[in-house]
Design a protein with these regions (language model features):
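Long, ordered, helix-rich scaffold segments
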Residues: 134-136, 157-167, 173-388
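Beta-propeller domains with acidic blade repeats across secreted/periplasmic ectodomains
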Residues: 1-193, 204, 212-214
């Protein structure tokens, strides 16, 4: 909805922010901030002279490989380049759209170094199931604009301003207890072979197969993808296949319908989000099944709210009204509902008269209605001031 001016999101931390370096870390910016110097907090632990909380969390990845033990599935790896470590975070999905995290190693880190030039800046899942760590391997990590006089002295005192050693380093971290996947060049595979890889246990293979299919724009894969969407028992394969169809421009009501009938909430959520991208005529073909849906999880509610608005029928608006009333305090649901009501705000408000107490939501409906003559319809290419 081009008239949406609200910005909603979930920005709570996933897991602890604490760090456990294995060397003293005075070479971080604002390390001089300490209670002993009259500040309210400490940047470094006064007893160990080590950083207390992350200050330079950089590139991260979620482990989706096959080499590490099973308990590693969906653990996040976060690089901390200022204090020479890579943090592991155990992620839990509550099912209500929020993630939580714990530190699986207690007061130890998954990977840490005493070499002050070790600057991990990114992490990747590898084709063989291992993890690749990108190490900038450089003395100075701070941008010149933010090098304080304190930090400058730290760099100079230990010769960290000296020449870099090569062009950085790549580390492959693997489990000796697990096997490594054999490498294959996915660019040389046929469409049927790539579609089969959408069910692969290694997330790198799934992602890359999807990308190659879309890059090729090979629409001959469409029937195979539709079969995976409709019949596969692998939820991840169904989701990848659906979004491959989207990338090929082959989304349709018939391809999305099996997703909406799935038992797995994540599959249904993908189906709802894909449905919101359909042309109006195709979306209307899904009206009956969408109206029968009830959110199996709290996470599903915003996606259902988003797709009900464009249906623009009394039954759809009645269902949307009930969702909004039940989720009156959930900004994600309210934002999704309003986003789907492009050029329909006033009609929806009239249909649901007197049922809403949330004044912010009502004011957004009024604003959208007043802006309707001037704004583009969602889905049209925007230009000029509309593109801002």
């Amino acid at each position: 909805n081009p008239g949406v001016t609200t910005k909603v999101g979930e920005f709570s931390p996933v897991g602890p922010n604490a760090t456990w370096p294995i060397r003293v870390t005075p070479g971080v910016n604002r390390a001089y901030i300490a209670k002993k110097n009259g500040y309210a907090t400490d940047t470094l632990n006064p007893e160990t002279n080590k950083l207390i909380n992350c200050t330079a969390a950089a590139g991260m990845t979620v482990y989706r490989g096959t080499n590490f033990p099973k308990e590693w599935a969906n653990r996040a790896l976060v690089t901390e380049s200022c204090v020479q470590l890579v943090k592991a975070v155990e992620i839990k999905d509550s099912g209500n759209g929020k993630l939580s995290g714990t530190h699986p190693y207690g007061k130890d880190e998954w990977l840490a170094s005493t070499d002050e030039r070790f600057r991990p800046v990114n992490a990747y899942n590898a084709p063989d199931g291992s993890v690749i760590i990108v190490d900038m391997y450089h003395g100075i990590i701070q941008h010149k604009t933010f090098v304080t006089s304190y930090l400058r002295e730290q760099y100079l005192s230990r010769g960290l301003d000296g020449p870099a050693h090569g062009q950085g380093r790549l580390y492959r971290v693997r489990s000796t207890a697990g096997k490594l996947e054999a490498y294959q060049d996915l660019d040389k595979l046929t469409a049927p072979e790539l579609v089969k890889l959408l069910s692969h246990a290694n997330g790198w293979h799934r992602d890359t197969a999807q990308r190659v299919l879309v890059d090729r724009a090979d629409v001959s894969a469409t029937p195979l993808l539709e079969e995976v969407v409709a019949k596969s028992e692998n939820p991840l394969a169904r989701i990848h296949a659906l979004w491959t169809l989207e990338g090929l421009g082959k989304l349709s009501a018939s391809s999305i319908q099996p997703m909406l009938a799935a038992k797995n909430p994540k599959v249904v959520i993908s189906g709802l989000w894909a449905a919101s991208k359909l042309p109006q005529a195709e979306l209307e073909k899904l009206s009956a099944i969408i109206l029968k849906l009830e959110p199996a999880t709290e996470e599903m509610t915003p996606y259902l709210a988003r797709v009900l608005g464009p249906l623009a029928t009394p039954a759809a608006w009645e269902k949307l009204t009930n969702l909004v009333v039940k989720s009156d305090k959930n900004p994600l649901v309210l934002g999704a509902a309003y986003s789907g009501l492009d050029h329909q705000e006033l009609k929806f408000k009239e249909a649901a008269a007197g049922k809403f107490k949330n004044k912010d939501f009502l004011s957004q409906l009024d604003k959208g209605a007043s802006d309707a003559p001037a704004k583009k319809t969602a889905g049209e290419l925007l230009s000029g001031e509309n593109a801002a």
